[in-house]
Amino acid sequence: MAGCDDGEILLLAGYPFHMKQPAERMSQLFDKYDSILRQVLGSEVVGVYSMGSGAIPGMVGSPMIDILLAMRNAPPTEDQLSKLKEIGIGLIGDGKSPHDPSDTWFQNLDFPTQGNFEEFKANGAHPPDGYLGRLIVHFCPYQSQFVHNSLCYVKYLKQNKDAFNRYRAVKIEGARMQCDGNEIKGGESGMSAFRKYKMHKSKVVKDLIEESKTWGEKEGNFNLPRELM
């Protein structure tokens, strides 16, 4: 896109939006949590996957990562909630994700004592919401359609250049409209710049989700990982 600086970081009400994601460090963070989640939750874990923008190489956006945690049971039991709390992971609100009824979502509120997370700290402390080191965990039953659709969506955007470009373009457009210091912010709705950015891209995201479902239904385009079948 013209005028796009790969090294540029925009701020949306204080939330960083990277024109070039710190992909290697995001992958390192995912690997650390993949290992710890499997250790803590044991055999109830079927699979741990990267989802959302952070799972799509070359995509712009927040450096936060989204982890899709495919479980044999869902929603989480009290014992599982306790185990997640011990590694610094707590429910977002009441845990009911707006994405899907089968999705119980969490965020990391502190780093686990297992492993070394020093490189992900900000000024020696757990980073603020929206920054590298923060993440969302989607706790879902492994056979749910949400798991299937989330993984199919990522593969579709990895393989379809037009879909990738449309998603990237609307994200950049929305971020530039709402970045700190930009006067083109619309009326005083009381809605945060980050929320306005999310709404700006929602129509394109909805279209891409439906496209990915149609694409995934064609033989040979998408297969679930073996452990989910």
Predicted regions and their residues:
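Helical scaffold of the NTase/Pol beta-like nucleotidyltransferase catalytic core
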Residues: 1-49
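Short, flexible turn/loop "capping" segments at secondary-structure junctions
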Residues: 9-12, 59-62, 129, 148
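Short amphipathic alpha-helical segments
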Residues: 15, 63-67, 133-135
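Short histidine-centered catalytic/ligand-binding loop motif
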Residues: 15-25, 68-72, 152-157
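Active-site nucleotide-donor binding segment shared across nucleotidyl transfer reactions
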Residues: 36-78
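Short amphipathic alpha-helices in soluble, non-transmembrane regions
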Residues: 79-88
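Conserved catalytic core of two-metal-ion nucleotidyltransferases
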Residues: 88-143
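Catalytic cores of NTP-dependent nucleotidyl/adenyl transfer enzymes across multiple folds
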Residues: 134-229
